[in-house]
């Protein structure tokens, strides 16, 4: 596919950029369609995204767009595509650009121009009577847009600032072919069925309340799931030579100034005043881990020190960005901070990567790796950053691991290796990270005494496996569609007495399972067995159902139905041994 670039040239697109350009052009065509249907609409931003495209629209007073209006907008978009309008591009000096946008009543574009650097190039793309300020590139003719669909509408503040006006965000998807679009729409339908918010309600895992937006409540079943995950985390970290610490939730502002968070992260932090002194609720665990290291002298013989922490952190997120467990304002982070000598660095990074790999294999996740380099807003010298990035590269190459470089996406204090999981729907989630930090040991004057009795500065590694525990739980819910493996399932077995005659026997069986350490529930309600089975399978999503009628009472055995709907008869002892083996091996 050829594209029109903002210098006026037309060139063949690299294959990996085709979808992005199609989506960007779809956003312009959607805006043109909306302008035809709602002539007084003003437009803010309309980019392509990893998942589709959107445009933020300011509609006239009293006018609203809902999903009911999508067929009309899509029909107008198809007209524009059929008209096969040519995309053209031109550049204007700042004054002329402002005049053009003012003449067309595009107040948001005028404000955006004012935010640009004085020497910024200002280019416009036009198709038919629609003009949009844009850097491109775009398709050459509207007919090149073959497959698109509008998918949702929501609110979004102008520039993401809650003090600004709330605009209407219209989302869509676009692909090169109808087959790709159909496949994507099927995936979206499947994603709706797997929505962790829906499954979380059905399985009594967690809830959200208006009284605490962005702060999840975990229910009893959710706590079983969460604690089972944490038990697994503690077991594998103990085996890998980690110790566990816990650091305070609230620490004074000076600590965060020393760490660099106050200068680089304060907009995301909550603060309070205690005894006339300003304190911050921690957004990250690392400064607390540094204070633990600094609390006593260290010898080179003690290193590496691997200190893990399941720490509760709080980060301010805009209310409109909150989304179930995926985007919250407080969460538990499975951090660990490693303090190492230079000669230990590569082996420690390799050890961390292998640990993270073992975790993701346990849950059946494929993943790819990115090396994220220095961002614009960062601290430290060029030399330190070069050393840090080289240290991560060396470890990845020693592992023989393929990776992509993600320029400018490192943490403010150091570069990082990011792990992007692929779930059962093919979606990717950034979870695990390994970050190399020369800055915090310098800022806090961390030291150890080397073999030659001189004081040296340790290198610090920050790393997480799950990332946010809450977010990882959300990912697991959708990955497994609530059908967790036996070891992880909040309810591992549900006993279903067919009638009152088998109720006592069902309770006897449950007692044996409970005594063996199996999580079992007895559904002894006076309901038809078919209803109980459907609920256990579709709502509770249990690994095993025990269907217990008069036949089982007489034989003293149980009928076991698994998720394949296959039913087999076995003794209670056989079943207990089977389930315990699955729990032990985390199969």
Question: What is each model feature region?
Answer:
Residues 45:
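Conserved P-loop NTP-binding catalytic core
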